[in-house]
Every structure is written in C-alpha cells, then in structure tokens.
Amino acid sequence: MLSLSKNWNTLIKPNKVAYENFPETNNKAKIVVEPLERGFGLTLGNAMRRVLLSSLQGAAITSIKIPAIEHEFSSIPGVKEDVSEVILNIKGIEVKMHVAEKRIMKLKATGPCVVTAGMIETGHDVEILNPDHVICDLAKDKQLEMELTCKVGKGYVLSTNNYEDNLPIGEIAIDALFNPVKSVTYKVENTRVGQVTDYDKLIMFVETNGAVLPEMAVGLAARILQEQLQLFISFEEQEEDKQVKTDALPFSPYLLKRVDELELSVRSANCLKNDNIIYIGDLVKRTEADMLRTPNFGRKSLNEIKEILAKFNLRFGMDVPDWPPENMQELSKRYEDSYN
C-alpha cells in the first residue's frame, strides 16, 4: 500500500526564512523563503498576500462627534475644510490599541494652526502612529473640539456597518480601515538545491503602519492559514509513516546531507570532491587544520564552509558517534525530509 506520508515527505521544504528590514524604517521588510517546490511560490505568495491584506486584527477610528454638527454635510466655523473633508483626513489616522474595548479620544485646538493627529489626547491605551497627519486648518481665534471613538476590528468596514443602534445624536459613523498591513507585493524567482536549479524562491515585500512589525504580520497570516486548513486533514498517519519519526539517530540527520547539495563556490566544491568528502558528516569530522592541508583549499573556502555549517549548528572537529553508518544511503533517503 502506498505510504500516505510520501505525499508530503517527498516534497522539498523551505529550510530558511530571511527577514531584511529597510534601513529608513522598521515598518517595511523583505521576506525571502526558499527552497520551495515548483509552483509553490505562487501558491503560498498569493495566499499569504490575501490573508495579510484582509484578516489581521487592528484598530481604527469608527466615529466622531463635533459639538453643533449633526451630519457630514455640515461646515465647522473657522475650519477651512468641510466635515466631509475632515472625515476623509481622520480616516487616514493610524492608531494602535493596547486593549480590546473601545476608547474615546478627545481633540481640542485653538487657531490659527494646522490641526494634526498628534494633538489628539489618547490616554495610555491608544497610540497615534502618524502624529504629523493633517486633520484640518483652523482659523485665528477659532476653537475646535472633537471626540473620536476608536475600536478594534479587521478588514475594511463601511460607516453603515459602524453605525450602532444606540449611537448618540450628533455622533457620525465613518469608514474604518482596521488592517495594520498597508501593502504586500511578492515575486517568485528560481533557486538552486544541489544541481537542480528550478525550485522556487518566494520574495515578499510587506509594509505595515507600525502597529505590528512585518515579521509578526507574516507569522500571524501563516497561523491563520494553518488554522483554516487544519480541518481538511481527515486521516491519521499509518504506523509505517510514523516510524521515521520514532527511530533515533546517534547524530544529527543533517550529517546525512550530501555536500554537493550545499550552495558552495566552485573552488570549494571541487576541493571537497577531490578529497572524497561526500557527506556533511565526513566534513565535520575534519578539523580546520585538516582542511587547510587540502590542496587548493584556502582560508576563504574555510570561512565559506564554516558559515554554512553554522546554519545547521555544526562545526569542524566534531566527534560523531557511529560515523559512517553502514546503511548510509538508506538512512540518507529516509531522513531526507529532516534536513530539506
């Protein structure tokens, strides 16, 4: 009978996720995931993008109240913009809440001045993430008072859905963008595993409003997908599928990986091949001094390999019990999923 686990164990899995923040801000990041099976870059990239832009919890202003103003088609004495323009500007205020319950913030300003989001009195439970954002222009000797209600939610909610049955007279519900993720783009490139060069590399660019870091946003999106897909797994693994998990090796399964599957320079790869070093287990048993005695193998090649070994928590000069194993090829095939 065909082993069920071969449906997923024989597929290559990404062995690293690299996060790179842009120097000017922590709110933008480049995320690189590799290697992936052919086509999985597009599949995962599209799914992650849709979840990031639609399903993460965030905070937004959902209604405002201005004394003597009953609807959005009014004008405010001393304010250059009408209420509709003021509401449009308020929708651009980015907030972060530390509590789940709604909070009411207050704004008081005296002209002449440009009223900005940083003038809002928030308290300890709410942060304004873009304090320089302009709300309106206030004329000389004029005053502006306003109450702003802030809530937690997800996605984009129209003002009609923010309207509550008990909304006080004069309080105006507004559209709310709760999502903390501002933009997500991705692209798929080829990457190499060993001698195979047509695997996928997924590169995502994520920008948030600062309420959550891009790395955290990506992790939350992945968890949402995991929770949604879990229900589809309607079978139990067979005993033979679990056997690989229960068999214990006296050494790390990474040692069973062939060195020609590492992304080494041509010089380093040729030196290892000429010295009959086939598996990582063969490599880590050598000391640095042993390696430097290898013909054409210099300090640059040594540092290159040390950096790669460090990714697997390995180093030169390791004491590896029971190496090499008698059934090397069988073990290498069995534990292939563990180190890919």
Swiss-Prot record:
Pfam families found in the cross-reference section: RNA_pol_A_bac, RNA_pol_A_CTD, RNA_pol_L
EC numbers for this chain: 2.7.7.6
Position of the signal peptide: none
Q: Which GO terms describe its cellular component?
A: cytoplasm; DNA-directed RNA polymerase complex
The record's section on SUPFAM superfamilies has:
C-terminal domain of RNA polymerase alpha subunit (SSF47789), Insert subdomain of RNA polymerase alpha subunit (SSF56553), RBP11-like subunits of RNA polymerase (SSF55257)
Per its UniProt entry, which superkingdom is the organism in?
A: Bacteria
Output the Gene3D superfamilies linked to this UniProt entry.
5' to 3' exonuclease, C-terminal subdomain (1.10.150.20), DNA-directed RNA polymerase, insert domain (2.170.120.12), RNA polymerase, RBP11-like subunit (3.30.1360.10)
One example of the protein's molecular function in GO is: DNA-directed RNA polymerase activity
Return the protein name.
DNA-directed RNA polymerase subunit alpha
User: Does this entry carry the keyword Lyase?
Assistant: no
Gene symbol?
rpoA
Residue span of region Alpha N-terminal domain (alpha-NTD): 1-236
> Which keywords describe this protein according to UniProt?
DNA-directed RNA polymerase, Nucleotidyltransferase, Transcription, Transferase
Q: Which reaction does it catalyse?
A: RNA(n) + a ribonucleoside 5'-triphosphate = RNA(n+1) + diphosphate
